[in-house]
């Protein structure tokens, strides 16, 4: 897959290596087979009782969270945060409120990409999981050296956490809106009044069709409450994957940064993680300052004989771009033979891309020339994410 191939050369951020060392101290020399059993047990718990509370008071559940789910979720958050960095989403944000923080995986992923954040508030209803987060964050020397302050609270959305400095505060919801009644609670949270509103909101959800499509429906709720969608959407029109498809949903794909014990742990599991997917929304009260028009790649490359076709988003319609590398003149045919786009890639719009329209009403396809493919490739380089170390 293009996304994974393009990003496999990325090294893990230094903060992740520090987290890995801290987790090793907590986990000790656990038996990989027992760890795998704990992961499967927790996974089955969520499948059989999706609305039940997480059993963090159980040692086996905490072990599964720290050894398996935490590394995956901090990688997802890091990928999403880098999409935001690409657009300047975090500029002026100094305080991060992490609702349903768990062990702080979402916060760590964002801090790895955005070291400018000065303060973190971890909020969760579980004292057990916050105790684990406290232990983990206490062992992250780089946060202390950078002067980043953090605290843990057992407050919830219903208790009305109010940002001390709303104009420089971000509310993070990572894998919490899947819980029962969470969407209704989130809508009430948004309607508290401007004086209590967070400047920025980041939502990460599972990349299933149901969760992804439900998250996209929250776009309109955010827009109605005076937020601007920064990513992944490139426009404020209706979502084409909701309006013109019965099954498509918007999600991104990122590489996982995995700890040293992962290979032995994953050997005992049926699920493998060569790449990670996540659905997300980034919104701010402030409108994006970049007035340029962007196109977002929303599908993996489809190789259809000698044609490459990919789903893109630039407005309210479901659209594809396509090209035939074998039909290009030399040397373009050779240079572009293996070129395709990664899910989530962003490139600058140009009216010339849309002059050769093909396809059906619910899936317009636009055929690109070799010069237009070169132009898109150059745009990718111009807008490339430069991950923080």
Features from the language model and the residues they span:
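Class I SAM-dependent methyltransferase Rossmann-like catalytic core
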Residues: 54-80, 87
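Conserved SAM/SAH-binding beta-strand->alpha-helix loop
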Residues: 126
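Conserved beta-strand signature within the Rossmann-like core of class I S-adenosyl-L-methionine
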Residues: 197-206
């Amino acid at each position: 897959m293009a996304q994974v191939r393009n990003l496999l050369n990325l090294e893990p951020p230094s903060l992740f290596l520090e987290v890995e060392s801290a987790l090793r101290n907590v986990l000790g020399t656990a038996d990989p087979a027992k760890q795998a059993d704990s992961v499967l047990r927790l996974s089955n718990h969520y499948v059989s009782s999706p609305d039940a509370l997480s059993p963090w008071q159980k040692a086996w559940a905490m072990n599964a969270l720290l050894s398996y789910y935490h590394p995956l979720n901090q990688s997802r958050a890091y990928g999403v945060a880098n999409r935001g960095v690409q657009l300047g989403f975090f500029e002026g944000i100094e305080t991060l409120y992490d609702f349903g923080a768990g062990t702080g995986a979402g916060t760590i992923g964002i801090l790895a990409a955005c070291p400018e954040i000065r303060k973190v508030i971890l909020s969760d209803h579980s004292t057990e999981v916050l105790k684990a987060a406290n232990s983990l964050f206490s062992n992250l020397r780089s946060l202390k050296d950078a002067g980043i302050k953090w605290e843990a609270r057992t407050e919830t959305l219903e208790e009305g956490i109010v940002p001390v400095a709303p104009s420089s505060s971000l509310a993070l919801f990572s894998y919490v809106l899947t819980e029962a009644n969470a969407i209704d609670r989130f809508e009430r949270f948004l309607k508290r009044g401007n004086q209590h509103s967070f400047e920025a909101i980041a939502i990460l959800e599972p990349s299933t069709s149901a969760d992804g499509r439900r998250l996209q429906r929250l776009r309109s709720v955010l827009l109605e409450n005076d937020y601007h969608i920064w990513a992944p959407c490139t426009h404020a029109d209706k979502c084409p994957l909701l309006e013109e498809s019965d099954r498509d949903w918007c999600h991104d794909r990122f590489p996982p940064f995995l700890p040293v014990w992962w290979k032995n742990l994953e050997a005992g599991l049926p699920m493998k993680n060569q790449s990670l997917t996540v659905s997300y929304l980034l919104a701010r009260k402030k409108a994006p300052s970049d007035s340029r028009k962007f196109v977002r790649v929303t599908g993996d490359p489809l190789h259809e004989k000698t044609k490459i076709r990919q789903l893109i988003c630039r407005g309210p319609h479901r659209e594809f771009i396509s090209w035939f590398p074998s039909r290009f003149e030399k040397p373009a045919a050779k240079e572009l033979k293996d070129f395709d786009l990664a899910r989530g890639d962003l490139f600058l719009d140009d009216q010339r891309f849309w002059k050769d329209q093909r396809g059906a009403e619910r899936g317009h396809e636009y055929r690109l020339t070799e010069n237009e493919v070169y132009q898109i490739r150059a745009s990718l380089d111009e807008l490339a994410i430069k991950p923080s170390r």
